[in-house]
Amino acid sequence: MAEPHQEFDVTEDHAGTYGLGDRKDQGGYTMLQDQEGDTDAGLKESPLQTPAEDGSEEPGSETSDAKSTPTAEDVTAPLVDERAPGEQAAAQPHMEIPXGTTAEEAGIGDTPSLEDEAAGHVTQEPESGKVVREGFLGEPGPPGLSHQLVSGMPGAPLLPEGPREATRQPSGIGPEDTEGGRHAPELLKHQLLGDLHQEGPPLKGAGGKERPGSKEEVDEDRDVDESSPQDSPPSKVSPAQDGWPPQAAAREATSIPGFPAEGAIPLPVDFLSKVSTEIPASEPDRPSAGGAEGQDAPPEFTFHVEITPNVQKEQAHSEEHLRRAAFPGAPGEGPEAQGPSLGEDAKEADLPEPSEKQPAAAPRGKPISRVPQLKARMVSKSKDGTGSDDKKAKTSTRSSAKTLKNRPCLSPKHPTPGSSDPLIQPSSPAVCPEPPSSPKYVSSVTPRTGSSGAKEMKLKGADGKTKIATPRGAAPPGQKGQANATRIPAKTPPAPKTPPSSGEPPKSGDRSGYSSPGSPGTPGSRSRTPSLPTPPTREPKKVAVVRTPPKSPSSAKSRLQTAPVPMPDLKNVKSKIGSTENLKHQPGGGKVQIINKKLDLSNVQSKCGSKDNIKHVPGGGSVQIVYKPVDLSKVTSKCGSLGNIHHKPGGGQVEVKSEKLDFKDRVQSKIGSLDNITHVPGGGHKKIETHKLTFRENAKAKTDHGAEIVYKSPVVSGDTSPRHLSNVSSTGSIDMVDSPQLATLADEVSASLAKQGL
């Protein structure tokens, strides 16, 4: 669930600044959610801060717990810090909240508490980052603020964040990482751890612890918030109480590596080693924190380091920006990466590094109630870590447990007895995530009553454990307030879904549903609003969480549960076409019987007597064809053809002989034409020669009148041999004198030629 919010408004929410985006899938989260997210962040830290020596219950823890629970909803509707990072900084003016001041009283954790949870623990998780940032900005709410405020608080003994945190961190961070960190937080934690190792100095101080812690807690808190936003409340309470940015406090620790804060009892190095061993990634930062913060700081650092690796990258920027923007000491926080923070160092000197304080105050394994711290952290979470914690809690309950463990150390800023109780919840390593959820709610509401808040936190811690086992939704009720926290513990354990809805109605009020991320400024403002308003607001948040309930098992179940649909009563069903009669029909045809009855034809009579053949069996199987040759011996033919009776037609033996008849030899023509039998018609071999007669040309009149007749006849081929007439001269001239008949002959010839067409 953290992932949805992760991408919500990391840019807006200083995700880049806090590394929230890198941290627990909060890349998209808005650090602006700090206002509301601070509650989660603070809540997350609150569990860590639970081991506050103050013994004062950290209402923040319970509230944070409650807040953490809404993480599902927050994740669903991550509250973008309803203000831009700058707005948050402005909204979270640098203000040091008295150690006894409740997160709500400080007015830092109010809005974030339930609203952040309801609106979206995503916001709360981002608010974890915001917690640091708001701590820098002076928002007590930021988880980082919680730790650092606790650390920075002179009167606030360092929560045995080292011990508790070490103790928790092994179980809380381990589980949180395992549960919340397992999701994105653990990777982010390792990344953050790498960053923290790189930026170890910043993490070292309370600021380093907180900043890294806040960022890392924001990461881890997001895990915690995702798993159980309870962790954040302590952080929030712490910021509320101390009023100094968790990162500032962390930085104080960072800048003053060895000193445990005035009232803080430095945790032994063992805690750091313990935490380091348990939390490899977070441990490196924590050792740095431990160096800065002393032995007490390391446990706290462990938690913070766990959160800070990615956060530190973004936190370095975000913290610096927030601190510089909101707090004069913010720059010191910004340098958290650098390690010492001017403002935080001063604070560290001034305040007994609440985180260190608490670690010293509470044994490693002993949870310290820090209701005020939880409140501060709630505020921080609401403002800075709500989204982050919310997301974290959603992402992994273990993560939130870790955050709570570490944040209790941060929570020390509220050294009130209430502050110790929140830690007490987280004190159980396994339970840390759970107490954080319940502390969250306490943080927002209970910060005012530290002792009762712590107690409620404890109750919630017990419930929180159950809650942590259950969805975060259970934790959100704690955020409502001490009363809510107390109620919420019962509510939360039975039905995580109900706590978000009942405990988080304030959330929805503040966050006004998931829409509040849309207006980052508003949730933050509400978050920073007086602590008292926060519980009611958180209840609205819970309403927002009510939206989350779907995420929580109870809500999911209730939503998923649909009235059983009764099976249709088929007995009363009537079919228009009577099909119900065959309702039980089982097709298959297996029982079909084919009855073959033979017809009795004995009485049948045929019209045409065919009955006689009724028994006839066609087929001719028994038909016999008898071939009897006909005896023709006695047959006589009418015309004596009997003689040819054996004649075989076909003429097989007939031979056709063709003989040419020599009719020329045998035939004689009647008229003696035989003589001309060889006659070739047309004169066969004879040539017909035509000679052109030129007599006309040469003819002369009978009477020689002296005129010569000129006659031109067509040229006749010379092929033909001219027949020379006796009376025709070679020249063709006719000697009329010699042939008196020539004239007549010539005329005849001319006539014949003319006929022939010559």
UniProtKB/Swiss-Prot annotation:
Subunit structure of this chain's protein: Interacts with MARK1, MARK2, MARK3 and MARK4. Interacts with SQSTM1 when polyubiquitinated. Interacts with PSMC2 through SQSTM1. Interacts with FKBP4. Binds to CSNK1D. Interacts with SGK1. Interacts with EPM2A; the interaction dephosphorylates MAPT at Ser-396. Interacts with PIN1. Interacts with LRRK2. Interacts with LRP1, leading to endocytosis; this interaction is reduced in the presence of LRPAP1/RAP.
Molecular function GO labels: microtubule binding
GO biological process assignments: microtubule cytoskeleton organization; neuron projection development; positive regulation of axon extension; positive regulation of microtubule polymerization
Comp. bias regions, Pro residues: 491-503
Ranges of biased composition (kind: Acidic residues): 217-228
Domain notes from UniProt: The tau/MAP repeat binds to tubulin.
Protein name: Microtubule-associated protein tau
Extent of the Tau/MAP repeats: 561-591, 592-622, 623-653, 654-685
Main localization (coarse): cytoplasm
PTM notes: Polyubiquitinated. Requires functional TRAF6 and may provoke SQSTM1-dependent degradation by the proteasome.
Annotated compartments: Cytoplasm, Cytosol; Cell membrane; Cytoplasm, Cytoskeleton; Cell projection, Axon
Key words of the record: Acetylation, Cell membrane, Cell projection, Cytoplasm, Cytoskeleton, Isopeptide bond, Membrane, Methylation, Microtubule, Phosphoprotein, Repeat, Ubl conjugation
Modification sites for Phosphoserine: 46, 61, 214, 502, 508, 512, 515-516, 519, 531, 552, 554, 579, 602, 606, 610, 622, 641, 669, 673, 713, 717, 721, 726, 733, 739
Residues that bear Phosphotyrosine: 18, 29, 514, 711
The protein's role, per its UniProt record: Promotes microtubule assembly and stability, and might be involved in the establishment and maintenance of neuronal polarity. The C-terminus binds axonal microtubules while the N-terminus binds neural plasma membrane components, suggesting that tau functions as a linker protein between both. Axonal polarity is predetermined by tau localization (in the neuronal cell) in the domain of the cell body defined by the centrosome. The short isoforms allow plasticity of the cytoskeleton whereas the longer isoforms may preferentially play a role in its stabilization.
UniProt entry tagged with the keyword Metal-binding: no
Modified residues (N6-acetyllysine): 480, 542, 576, 598, 607, 615, 628, 634, 638, 648, 660, 664, 686, 702
Gene Ontology CC: one annotated term: cytosol
Membrane topology category: Peripheral membrane protein
Polar residues biased stretches: 61-71, 440-452, 718-733
Chain positions of cross-link Glycyl lysine isopeptide (Lys-Gly) (interchain with G-Cter in ubiquitin): 44, 571, 576, 584, 598, 615, 628, 634, 638, 648, 660, 664, 670, 686, 692, 702
Pfam families reported for this sequence: Tubulin-binding
